[in-house]
Structures are given as structure tokens and as C-alpha cells.
Curated annotation (Swiss-Prot):
Signal peptide: none annotated. This is Ubiquitin-conjugating enzyme E2 2. Belongs to the ubiquitin-conjugating enzyme family. It is found in: Cytoplasm; Nucleus. Residues 149-179 have a biased composition (Acidic residues). Catalyzes the covalent attachment of ubiquitin to other proteins. Plays a role in transcription regulation by catalyzing the monoubiquitination of histone H2B to form H2BK123ub1. H2BK123ub1 gives a specific tag for epigenetic transcriptional activation and is also a prerequisite for H3K4me and H3K79me formation. Also involved in postreplication repair of UV-damaged DNA, in N-end rule-dependent protein degradation and in sporulation. Keywords: ATP-binding, Chromatin regulator, Cytoplasm, DNA damage, DNA repair, Nucleotide-binding, Nucleus, Sporulation, Transcription, Transcription regulation, Transferase, Ubl conjugation pathway. Its EC number is 2.3.2.23. The active site is at C88 (glycyl thioester intermediate). GO terms for biological process: cellular response to unfolded protein; cellular response to UV; cytoplasm protein quality control by the ubiquitin-proteasome system; DNA damage response; DNA repair; DNA-templated transcription termination; double-strand break repair via homologous recombination; ERAD pathway. The keyword Nucleotide-binding applies. Residues 151-179 are annotated as: Acidic tail. GO terms for cellular component: chromosome, telomeric region; cytoplasm; fungal biofilm matrix; HULC complex; MUB1-RAD6-UBR2 ubiquitin ligase complex; nucleus; Rad6-Rad18 complex; RAD6-UBR2 ubiquitin ligase complex.
């Protein structure tokens, strides 16, 4: 069923494909245009450089009049990211405008990585390290970057484990005695 929100999301997707912003990518899930997977590459010359951070964007039928929920799936150590992965970003709350699209949301999140708002932290520990012990903050961020490279490996291992479990189940079926 085509709704204004779904039509707008398809326009956003088309724009992402025709004019992809640097360092970000996103696409709707194959079976649900209201949920998108996204990846942000950590900006050059920042502690986040070369990180590959996965996010999930969840839209409802109020989009673009209401912002999506944006959540890091990858581990993220940042003053404006809650432990749950949820973001504290003004354009996703009180400064939302229907003129924002998926591309502008992701580029805003990308720029937030190196320019946190420490006056309103979601992660107090990260904010305090950023303010008072920058070298420790950078060290923790670099660990997060390294972990982001393993996210894909973890997913592949989980898929392999699931495949092996299915194969074992198939073997068990072969051993059933029929009377």
C-alpha cells in the first residue's frame, strides 16, 4: 500500500542512490520500506576514522512530519549515544524539520561523531573523558572503531553457526527409526 510516508521514503532512497553522500549509505530492508539499515564510515582525521558503524532507522507513517528513530547497532562510545545505541541529536527531537531526509540525517550523525554536544550528554562517562581526559577518550573511541570491524565477522559467524545447527537438525531427521 502506497502512503505519503512510503512514497517519501522511496524518494529518499532514490536520492541516496543518485547522489550518495560521502561516507554514509542506507537502504530499506527488503521486506519493509519503513526500516532501513545504514552504515556510517568514521570521518577522516578524527578518532572515529575508518570505523564502520551500523545503524537502524525506523520510520512510521508520520514521516516526514515526525523524525525516525535512529539507533546504532554497532557498539558506540560517544557523549551523545546512550548505551542502548539511541542517539541524543537535536534534529531527531525538538529541531526536526520535514525537509530533512535520510541523507541529511546520516550526514548529521556522521558530523556529530567528531563534534559532540557535551552540554547534554547521553553517555556521561564519554562526555567527562572528552572534556577532561581527551587521550583516554580517543583510546576508547579507537577500541570502538576496531570493534566495528569485527561486527561483520560476528554476524558471519552467527550465520555459520545457524547453518551448522540446521545441518545437524537435518542429520537427526535421517536417524529417526520408523516402525
Amino acid at each position: 500500500m502506497s502512503t505519503p510516508a512510503r512514497r517519501r521514503l522511496m524518494r529518499d532512497f532514490k536520492r541516496m542512490q543518485q547522489d550518495p553522500p560521502s561516507g554514509v549509505s542506507a537502504s530499506p530492508l527488503p521486506d519493509n520500506v519503513m526500516k532501513w539499515n545504514a552504515v556510517i564510515i568514521g570521518p577522516s582525521d578524527t578518532p572515529f576514522e575508518d570505523g564502520t558503524f551500523r545503524l537502524l532507522l525506523s520510520f512510521d507513517e508520520q514521516y516526514p512530519n515526525k523524525p525516525p528513530q535512529v539507533k546504532f547497532i554497532s557498539e558506540m562510545f560517544h557523549p551523545n549515544v546512550y548505551a542502548s545505541g539511541e542517539l541524543c541529536l537535536d534534529i531527531l527531537q525538538n529541531r526536526w524539520s520535514p525537509t530533512y531526509d535520510v541523507s541529511s540525517i546520516l550526514t548529521s550523525v556522521q558530523s556529530l561523531l567528531n563534534d559532540p554536544n557535551i552540554s547534554s550528554p547521553a553517555n556521561v562517562e564519554a562526555a567527562n573523558l572528552y572534556k577532561d581526559h581527551r587521550s583516554l577518550y580517543v583510546k576508547r573511541v579507537r577500541e570502538t572503531v576496531e570493534n566495528s570491524w569485527n561486527d561483520d565477522d560476528d554476524e558471519e559467524e552467527e550465520e555459520e553457526d545457524e547453518d551448522e545447527a540446521e545441518d545437524e537438525d537435518d542429520d537427526d531427521d535421517d536417524n529417526i527409526d520408523e516402525d
